[in-house]
UniProtKB/Swiss-Prot annotation:
Entry annotated with the keyword Repeat: no
Prodomain residues: 185-203
Keywords: Cell membrane, Glycoprotein, GPI-anchor, Lipoprotein, Membrane, Signal
Topology versus the membrane: Lipid-anchor; GPI-anchor
Glycosylation sites: 28, 138
Primary localisation category: membrane
GO cellular component, one term: side of membrane
Signal peptide interval: 1-23
Annotated lipid attachment (GPI-anchor amidated asparagine): 184
Disulfide bonds: none
Name assigned to this protein: Putative GPI-anchored protein YAR066W
Localization in the cell: Cell membrane
Amino acid sequence: MFNRFNKFQAAVALALLSRGALGDSYTNSTSSADLSSITSVSSASASATASDSLSSSDGTVYLPSTTISGDLTVTGKVIATEAVEVAAGGKLTLLDGEKYVFSSDLKVHGDLVVEKSEASYEGTAFDVSGETFEVSGNFSAEETGAVSASIYSFTPSSFKSSGDISLSLSKAKKGEVTFSPYSNAGTFSLSNAILNGGSVSGL
């Protein structure tokens, strides 16, 4: 059991930490069982400080409590049950996932980008339903090639934006954007979307 825990710690370190001073970059492909166990350890946290990427064999990545201050690309579906923060100057790229769930705090002070590498794909389901969703940086999604409707749901207890939120969805299959009442001091731009929203202050 002790050896297994040590291997787990090493896997986490390789996946989420890089030696920025040397410019090294690590790419890790880990089973969902290993990744999901991260969230069961209350003291587990991670910091991506340089150029990293995460993927898993079954297409689902379970993010631990994480602060991202460098560039991190996550490929596939993402489940985050603990707080995720993209620090100023950091970038989180969510690549080729059909579902993203953030059920704790999501704070974007840098850049969070939803991207696809294929010309056509199924629409994305993106759900933020934790305590706090805060954007002072840039949140953008480019879904113009979706062949089914993309669904974006921003329904946290507290939703504040002083940055830029941009959702460009498919013309062929209009997406749906649902948001709870929120405070806006930035820019929220949508295209090809059906809106289901609460009140907005600060416009």
